Amino acid sequence: MASVAAAAVSVPSFSGLKAETKAAPARLSSTSVVRMAPVVRASASSDALKTVGKALLAASSSLLLVASANAATVKMGGDDGALGFYPKDISVAAGESVTFVNNKGFPHNVVFDEDAVPAGVKTEDINHEDYLNGPNESFSITFKTPGTYEFYCEPHQGAGMKGVVTVS
């Protein structure tokens, strides 16, 4: 006949226990550490600030002069390769410059129609008849006399590559 054995297991109960929350006292060291801020002479600091300020003023003044002297940039040829000046109508103040930049590498130039510039302006002084053949080749023209200046690209005039500069 079979026999059955029973085993008894005792499980301790943890109900009602509380964790102690006291912290151990901190230990103090007899070694002291003193941190000091760096010493800066006020005159050296203000001299440096004055120098930086002058440099910033000079740089910003130079940028303003360049920005006002070069009033417009005209791409010769479109980003998609189209023949044209972009923009084709430009307005600037007298004494300002327009920079023409060859955009895609076709041979381009800028020729002013002698019958379509203000009286007294010599087109040979402002024409750029030499071809710009490579991308990003450029030249600038400063317009001194107020009025309307019509220009074109000599090899692409028949394709409508024309523009107008209005100087006030």
Curated annotation (Swiss-Prot):
Listed GO MF terms: copper ion binding; electron transfer activity
Q: Which UniProt keywords apply?
A: Chloroplast, Copper, Electron transport, Membrane, Metal-binding, Plastid, Thylakoid, Transit peptide, Transport
Q: Which SUPFAM superfamilies match?
A: Cupredoxins
Give the membrane topology. Peripheral membrane protein
What subcellular locations does the record give? Plastid, Chloroplast thylakoid membrane
Q: Which Gene3D superfamilies match?
A: Cupredoxins - blue copper proteins
FT transit peptide: 1-70
Instruction: List positions binding Cu cation.
Output: 108, 153, 156, 161
Keyword Plastid found: yes
Domain (Plastocyanin-like) spans 71-168
An example Gene Ontology CC term for this record: chloroplast thylakoid membrane
Question: Which co-factors does it depend on?
Answer: Cu(2+)
Family per UniProt?
Belongs to the plastocyanin family.
What is this protein's function per UniProt?
Participates in electron transfer between P700 and the cytochrome b6-f complex in photosystem I.
Name by which UniProt lists this protein: Plastocyanin, chloroplastic
Q: Which organism is it from?
A: Physcomitrium patens
